[in-house]
A protein has these predicted regions:
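Enriched for short, Lys/Arg-rich terminal
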Residues: 2-6, 10, 16-17, 21-24, ...
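A short, surface-exposed loop/turn module that caps and links secondary-structure elements
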Residues: 29-54
Length: 86
């Protein structure tokens, strides 16, 4: 199954600031998202439908729209910072 990957501005801003090796690792993990490795659904009512992908010390927050086969990356950040927002 082929998914379309959409990276929102908030996540893109964080990713472009990463050093090259980390940026490549995070982007590689994002484009492998549909296969799913270290993926968990976020807890809490306000986080319904949001998932997190762990990439080293970084977390990628995303949602999946199976009707349209879209993975939408909504945010990314350091572990401590990202969980304060979600």
């Amino acid at each position: 199954m082929k998914y379309t990957i959409v990276i929102e501005k908030l996540a893109e801003k964080f990713i472009v600031k990463l050093p090259k090796p980390e940026k490549e690792r995070v982007l590689k993990a994002i484009y492998q998202l549909p296969e799913g490795n270290d993926i968990k659904e976020l807890k809490g009512k306000k986080n319904k439908g949001l998932y997190r992908l762990r990439v080293s010390d970084y977390r990628v927050i995303y949602t999946i729209d199976n009707g349209k086969l879209i993975v939408c990356v909504v945010d990314a950040g350091n572990r401590g910072d990202i969980y304060k927002r979600y």
